[in-house]
Regions:
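Acidic/glycine-enriched connector segments
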Residues: 2-235
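SIR2/sirtuin-family catalytic core signature
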Residues: 216, 227-251, 255
Length: 255
């Protein structure tokens, strides 16, 4: 396992990063990054594609008014994919906007992101500049990081409550959701945010959908709340999920 190094991201901002090759190295790697457990973990997965401007504005407020303040209040760490797009960008910007101090950890394939020692390429994606730590993992395709992201969350939680929030999302988010459910992590689906989130919200309402969605409902770990619900309602539901006995929540649809 390599030692941590600093990544210069943008505007003079830097963040510590570490590259791992084996799941067995994760505990040591996270300690090397000065990330300690146990602590509550919020996992954020999904995207922001094909979202209307009105819904996009509402989504940004979800991060600024609910997710970032909740993480700060709980003393949680937040784990996501770390790139400067979609929900990961929103999470980083929300953390900066409220001047939060919680660790924001990006887990991403080393081969898919722009790194200081690499010749610039249109084939790589920029890292989000407000993340505080990066874990760089093996893989050459988006989705290769999904099991690693779930493992990072589990290692950091170390028995403390953890919850996954799904916003929008496509095929990679399916992998993220699946891996986090394997880890017995409750899932909150933001209904009305589009694509995968709406597919899963429909399944939670009992509407006919594909087999993967039916399996998710059968897990009993997933529930949904509509994007149009009040931010107080969203905050209250997430607090309930974090405090649920054993970290499990009953499946239901709100709104």
């Amino acid at each position: 396992m390599e030692k941590p190094f600093k990544i210069a991201i943008s505007n003079g901002l830097t963040a510590p990063a570490i590259q791992v090759q084996s799941p067995e190295d994760l505990s040591t790697a996270l300690r090397e990054l000065d990330l300690h457990s146990p602590r509550p973990i919020l996992v954020v997965v999904g995207g922001a594609s094909k979202v209307s401007e009105a819904d996009l504005s509402r989504l940004r407020l979800l991060f600024v008014k609910v997710l970032a303040p909740l993480a700060e209040e709980l003393g949680a760490s937040v784990v996501d994919g770390g790139t400067d797009v979609g929900v990961m960008q929103m999470m980083g910007q929300a953390r900066a906007e409220i001047a939060a101090t919680f660790p924001l950890i990006g887990v991403t394939p080393a081969a898919k992101v722009a790194l200081p020692d690499r010749i610039p390429s249109s084939k790589v994606t920029a890292l989000e500049p407000h993340h505080t730590h990066f874990v760089l993992v093996p893989g050459s395709n988006w989705g290769d990081e999904s099991p690693w992201l779930a493992r990072v969350a589990s290692v950091l939680a170390n028995g403390a409550p953890s919850v996954t929030v799904l916003v929008n999302g496509g095929e990679t988010a399916w992998k993220d959701v699946s891996e986090n459910l394997k880890a017995n992590r409750p899932l909150l689906v933001i209904a009305g945010s589009g694509r995968l989130a709406d597919t899963l919200a429909a399944a939670l309402r009992g509407e006919a959908t594909d087999e993967r969605a039916r399996e998710l409902v059968a897990s009993g770990l997933a529930q949904a709340i509509d994007l149009t619900e009040s931010f107080d309602s969203l905050t209250r539901l997430l607090n309930e999920m974090f405090s649920a006995k054993g970290g499990r929540s009953a499946s239901r649809e709100s709104g």
